[in-house]
């Protein structure tokens, strides 16, 4: 008779105890993000959240996103504390362009072998992003999947729900010729274009620890995505805003037209700002054409706001008081049928 070894889940590469240890580590992170509308704490099968008081006809707005291959660079450089901020930013910034106030956030974290310290650093960043956007971290999923990911490599996705008054939804329908365009500065490449960034690093054989401006190339590339929630929501309460465009994958050419009516175009003054040094480095080191730069990267512009010319001074003053680097970047003009909807002069 042959003895059979008793196998466990841990023998198969899944450590339930490590998962439980992670949950204990991050309970305080979630607690710091709590909103009064949230019912209960972590650990339930689902998270419960009331609609905030004061809404007459509340509309829920949802969004989901990831961080893309910025994670590969972060993993290689063992910098896990800010990619969680990136994850939240990519989701909540997409909500506010429709006028929505973020309510709650959930994350999905998948790895081949769960490293509790790494995962806790990532989730701490998620908590920081939620605090910046006044959004409650109400739950998530940690999946340890041996054979699906190499070693301690990981991937993650975020999911966010917000709310907006039905009469205050921003959909670009009010955009008209004559509207002004205000830019909000980005903190760097944010979370887009990293497959090209990594290719440039490979081809140029660059040392990511080389000095760049006041810091290093690595720090410039991994700077967390700027979260615009609080200043933009304050702007929406105080100024008339016709559209907002989050400059993400697809850059200027693809994101601005998403909020423009037919027969209008955005005319951008390319001399109204200087690209941050990291974008000049990327263009030079990768010999990237300017059109491709504007197609792949934000080039220093994280968000663009369309509003009436009469609102420009008040909007700029408010945004600067909120700590944003904001400037007049262009205007909306009439466009002929079939004409491209974005010009950069």
Swiss-Prot record:
Subcellular location(s) of the protein: Cytoplasm
Top-level EC class as recorded in UniProt: ligase
BP GO annotations: 'de novo' IMP biosynthetic process; adenine biosynthetic process
Pathway(s) this gene product operates in, as recorded in its UniProt entry: Purine metabolism; IMP biosynthesis via de novo pathway; 5-amino-1-(5-phospho-D-ribosyl)imidazole from N(2)-formyl-N(1)-(5-phospho-D-ribosyl)glycinamide: step 2/2
Location (main, coarse): cytoplasm
InterPro entries in alphabetical order: PurM-like_C_dom (IPR010918), PurM-like_C_sf (IPR036676), PurM-like_N (IPR016188), PurM-like_N_sf (IPR036921), PurM_cligase (IPR004733)
EC number of the protein: 6.3.3.1
Signal peptide interval: none
Residue ranges of coiled coil: none
Recorded catalytic activity of this chain's protein: 2-formamido-N(1)-(5-O-phospho-beta-D-ribosyl)acetamidine + ATP = 5-amino-1-(5-phospho-beta-D-ribosyl)imidazole + ADP + phosphate + H(+)
One function term, GO molecular function aspect: phosphoribosylformylglycinamidine cyclo-ligase activity
Family of the protein in this entry: Belongs to the AIR synthase family.
NCBIfam families referenced in this protein's UniProt entry, alphabetically: purM
Protein's UniProt name: Phosphoribosylformylglycinamidine cyclo-ligase
Species for this entry: Tolumonas auensis (strain DSM 9187 / NBRC 110442 / TA 4)
Gene symbol of the encoding locus: purM
């Amino acid at each position: 008779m042959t003895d059979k070894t008793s196998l466990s889940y841990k023998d198969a590469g899944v450590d339930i105890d490590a998962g439980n240890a992670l949950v204990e580590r991050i309970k305080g992170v979630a607690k710091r993000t709590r909103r009064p509308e949230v019912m209960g704490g972590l650990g339930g099968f689902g998270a419960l959240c009331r609609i905030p008081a004061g809404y007459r006809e509340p509309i829920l707005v949802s969004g989901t996103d990831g961080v893309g291959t910025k994670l590969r660079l972060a993993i290689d450089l063992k910098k896990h504390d800010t990619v969680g901020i990136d994850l939240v930013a990519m989701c909540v910034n997409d909500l506010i362009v429709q006028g929505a106030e973020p309510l709650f956030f959930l994350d999905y974290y998948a790895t081949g072998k769960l490293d509790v310290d790494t995962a806790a650093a990532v989730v701490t960043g998620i908590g920081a992003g939620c605090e910046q956007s006044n959004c409650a971290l109400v739950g998530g999923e940690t999946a340890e999947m041996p054979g699906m990911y190499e070693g301690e490599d990981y991937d993650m996705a975020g999911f966010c729900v917000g709310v907006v008054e039905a009469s205050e939804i921003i959909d670009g329908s009010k955009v008209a010729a004559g509207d002004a365009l205000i830019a909000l500065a980005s903190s760097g490449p944010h979370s887009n274009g990293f497959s090209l960034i990594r290719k440039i690093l490979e081809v140029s054989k660059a040392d990511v620890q080389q000095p760049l401006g006041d810091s290093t190339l690595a720090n410039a590339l991994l700077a967390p995505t700027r979260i615009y929630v609080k200043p933009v929501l304050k702007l929406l309460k105080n100024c008339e805003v016709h559209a907002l465009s989050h400059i993400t994958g697809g850059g200027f050419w693809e994101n601005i037209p998403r909020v423009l009516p037919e027969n209008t175009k955005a005319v951008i003054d390319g001399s109204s700002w200087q690209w941050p040094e990291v974008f000049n480095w990327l263009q030079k080191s990768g010999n990237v054409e300017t059109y491709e730069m504007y197609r792949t990267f934000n080039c220093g512009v994280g968000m663009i706001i369309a509003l009436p010319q009469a609102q420009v001074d008040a909007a700029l003053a408010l945004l600067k008081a909120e700590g944003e680097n904001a400037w007049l970047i262009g205007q909306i003009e009439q466009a002929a049928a079939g004409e491209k909807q974005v010009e950069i002069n």
